[in-house]
UniProtKB/Swiss-Prot annotation:
Residues 1-25, 105-120, 165-170, 225-288, 347-352, 411-430, 478-517 are cytoplasmic. This is Sugar transport protein MST1. NCBIfam families: SP (TIGR00879). The gene is MST1. Belongs to the major facilitator superfamily. Sugar transporter (TC 2.A.1.1) family. It comes from Oryza sativa subsp. japonica (Rice). Mediates active uptake of hexoses by sugar:proton symport.
């Protein structure tokens, strides 16, 4: 591809793994970076539960409380349909979208580590404002500060993980971001469950967002930036020191550093206009397609709206407030367990196997929820659901969450973090994050209205999308397991379809210097 990098290979075009153990230093470094997902996960999990707390609703959304009191049979799907209530959740993602675009340039100019520090500070400020909110304006401002933190952290952390991790461990370590996101969701749901028992519990739930913010802020202060970022900013000596520390004995640090330096030299030749190159140049077509497709499909799995609104869905099918919150805790725990299992096998069996299995599970689950709600709640929401069927809805929702945790949960962060060449890596990640946040805003703002208008068909809608994305991944995604970042163009150039766009890397001996083409 134009602006690509020729890295050392073994003579048949395949990339060389420069080695590197799973050292204590790389584990600690990646744990701190991945903890950015903890804050995002906490914010994902907290808003849906808080939205079911009656003291919170009475203070900020009294119209919803009146609608709940006046609800008659036939209105179960529409009780929570409030644009103001969904704006409380979705405002975070408008701010995150804007911040992610700015963060692309900031990440390139100041480094990944500095952006994570900024993200932690913004998260802390947002948690403080929402925790002490006295009106809707303060709630929205606080959520927007949290959104700016999301935009910065989601831009920097996956890149940090992908660039720091040894090739053979890159999938598992990059998936750590989603693992911590799932941990954050579980912490949020447990917090909501216990906080709902006191009138001021909603303040506790919202304000505690500041706690994980302190973790990433202080942790990031002590991190060294990634070798790629240091080389891009002209500090090759620190880049070498960083590689020596995180790779350990036995790694060919000098060869890896040479590859990074050459990649950065190519990146500087086309430093400006990365977005324009992605859009205009034929050889960048695979990266452009996946920069759009990955975040779009990630959102259309339906897991985001389930994470936000599952307490409201559970109340819709007949559970009380506490039972609905406990159901959300169970969902978070299921997601976390499946993420742990996925992380253990992602670098053994590859990415595509996990996508296929997870996709099949999610389709079955969404169809099951649609069928039960259509048969038991009725087309107009006029029927009361028997408890066994309500439990089945929870079970199918857990199954969907399990499928997501096995596949798109970790891989939705792993794939975008590893497929882009260095000259468009920041731009590609910015596009991935901004599209994802933009679609999250659209979905969170529209889901309750969709549930009210399309009723059980909402879940069939998501099942259809999961079927589409599973076929797309099977056909168009090359397997990236075990491929060094600097050699990623090789797998695209050999793919049955993308080879007409991407270019094969010329063969060189392992000790030959690399160049550009």
């Amino acid at each position: 591809m134009a602006g690509g990098v020729i890295v050392a290979n073994d003579g048949d075009g395949s990339a060389v793994d420069h080695g590197g153990r799973l050292t204590f230093s790389v584990v600690i470094t990646c744990l701190v970076a991945a903890s950015g997902g903890l804050i995002f996960g906490y914010d994902v999990g907290i808003s849906g539960g808080v939205s079911t707390m009656e003291p919170f609703l009475r203070r900020f959304f009294p119209g919803v409380v009146r609608r709940m009191a006046e609800a008659r049979p036939g209105n179960e799907y529409c009780v929570y349909d409030s644009q103001a209530l969904t704006a409380f959740t979705s405002s975070l993602y408008v701010a995150g979208l804007v911040a992610s675009l700015v963060a692309s340039r900031v990440t390139r100019a100041m480094g990944r580590q500095a952006v994570m520090v900024m993200g932690g500070a913004l998260f802390f400020a947002g948690g403080a404002v929402t925790g002490f909110a006295v009106n809707i304006a303060m709630l929205i401002v606080g959520r927007m500060l949290l959104g700016f933190g999301v935009g910065f952290t989601n831009q920097a952390a996956p890149l940090f993980l992908a660039e720091m991790a040894p090739t053979r461990w890159r999938g598992s370590l990059t998936a750590g971001f989603q693992f911590f996101l799932a941990v954050g969701v579980v912490i949020a749901t447990v917090t909501n469950y216990f906080a709902s028992r006191v009138p001021w519990g909603w303040r506790l739930s919202l304000g505690l967002a500041g706690a994980p913010a302190v973790v990433i802020f202080l942790g990031a202060l002590f991190l060294t930036d990634t070798p790629s970022s240091l080389v891009m900013r002209g500090d090759t000596a620190r880049a070498r020191a960083a590689l020596l520390r995180v790779r350990g004995a036995g790694a060919d640090v000098e060869a890896e550093l040479k590859g990074i330096v050459r990649a950065v030299e190519v990146a500087r030749q086309g430093e400006d206009g990365a977005f324009r190159r992605m859009a205009a140049r034929r050889e960048y077509r695979p990266y452009l397609v996946f920069a759009v497709a990955m975040p779009m499909f990630f959102q259309l799995t339906g897991v985001i709206v389930i994470s936000f609104f599952s307490p409201l869905v559970f109340r819709t099918v007949g559970f009380g407030s506490n039972a609905a919150l406990m159901g959300n805790v169970i969902l978070g725990a299921v997601n976390l367990v499946c993420l742990m299992l996925s992380t253990l096998v992602i670098d053994r069996y590859g990415r595509k196997v996990l996508f296929m299995v997870g996709g099949a599970i999610m389709i079955i689950a969404q169809v099951g929820v649609a069928w039960i709600m259509g048969a038991q709640v009725g087309k107009n929401g006029s029927e009361a659901m028997a408890r066994p069927y309500a439990v089945a809805v929870v079970a199918f929702t857990c199954l969907h969450t399990a499928g997501f945790g096995w596949s798109w949960g970790p891989l939705g962060w792993v794939i975008p973090g590893e497929i882009f060449p260095v000259d468009i890596r920041s731009a590609g990640q910015a596009m991935n994050v901004s599209i994802g946040l933009g679609l999250t805003f659209v979905q969170t703002q529209s889901f309750l209205a969709m549930l009210c208008r399309f009723r059980y068909g909402t879940f069939a809608y998501y099942a259809a999308w999961v079927a589409v994305m599973t076929v797309f991944i099977a056909v168009f995604l090359p397997e990236t397991k075990g491929v060094p970042l600097e050699s990623m163009a090789t797998v695209w150039a050999r793919h049955w379809y993308w080879k007409r766009f991407a270019r094969e890397q010329p063969k060189t001996s392992a000790d030959e210097p690399t160049g550009t083409y």
